[in-house]
Amino acid sequence: MERSFMKNNSSVNMTSWMGRVDHEDGELGLRWHQKVKVTNSTNQDGIMLLGFACDEGVIRNKGRKGAYAAPQVIRRALANLAWHHQSDVYDGGDIQCNDGDLELAQKQLGIKIKSALANRHQVIVLGGGHEVAWGSFQGIARYLQSRAVLTSPTPPPRIGIINFDAHFDLRNLSQSPSSSASQSSKQYGNSGTPFHQISEFCHVQHWPFHYACLGLNKGSNTQALYHKAKQLGVLHFDDIEMNLLNLPQIKQALSEFIEQNDFLYLTIDIDVFPASCAPGVSAPAVRGVSLDIIESLLPDILKAKNQHGESKLLLADLAEFNPTFDIDNQTARLVARLVWTIAHGMKSNM
């Protein structure tokens, strides 16, 4: 029987959570599809999965469409993975951008994230293009602003954004959704602008902007973007630097970055990986960063605690998976492994 619920452009469709059942192993043989639950207003202190079914930002950025379908494909890849987790996992459904109104979809995602965080969940968002990042940050900001109202006066929050990505995504907004000439004075975001939008928001709010971008393809980022990153104080490493020889230096820099922040937001653009293991993206990487390097850096992010012993990581999202161009579901399985690893690390000592 299909289990499906609709609310405010958000759907919960549990039909993707199907897979193998090992009755002979009892509780020790459970898999994700047997453990993930539908969210409701009474759920607290777990992990909330939210989908962002959207590739409008990729289309505006002249990329290859197809990321809209990613959240459900990721769920299907997750469904059959073995359950080794300590926390309940809830499915909060998808925010769907069906009409080109990216800004509304990002706002709705932010509202759902704020609600999940207020209910003491940590959140994993399944994108969608990397325009998801602006919606994710809106949710974090809404949550922290609501906390500040209750506990004011309070200093500005120090939010550390850690982005594994081949691109800075610091581009300026365009004057039209299609990036073509327009007489409109309104500016539009896309999949290449989210961290510019976040930096502008932080500037208006008088919040510090702390951004780390690891895995950059220098040939895909202009001098203007490197200059802008320097002006904004961005911590960054190019893909050619992301190797075992440099791993201690990178871990040290990341540790110092984590230490100076009260909260963390982790975002992984799947195009940071080599095309050989992640063909299903809008912009496949020629070189990329190996999975073993990125998995070596994740524990420090997932285990980071504040002075109260609470996890600094509020939210993680995964972006730019494009099932249209995947080969034998290998990118889907890669994304599922990352979600599995993040969810496991959020509620354990890894």
From Swiss-Prot:
Mn(2+) 2 binds at residues 165, 167, 269, 271. It is an enzyme of class 3 (hydrolase). Mn(2+) 1 binds at residues 130, 165, 169, 269. GO terms for molecular function: agmatinase activity; formimidoylglutamase activity; manganese ion binding. Its cofactor is Mn(2+). GO terms for biological process: L-histidine catabolic process to glutamate and formamide; L-histidine catabolic process to glutamate and formate; putrescine biosynthetic process from arginine, via agmatine. InterPro entries: HutG, Ureohydrolase, Ureohydrolase_dom_sf, Ureohydrolase_Mn_BS. This is Formimidoylglutamase. It comes from Aliivibrio fischeri (strain ATCC 700601 / ES114). The lineage of its organism: Bacteria, Pseudomonadati, Pseudomonadota, Gammaproteobacteria, Vibrionales.
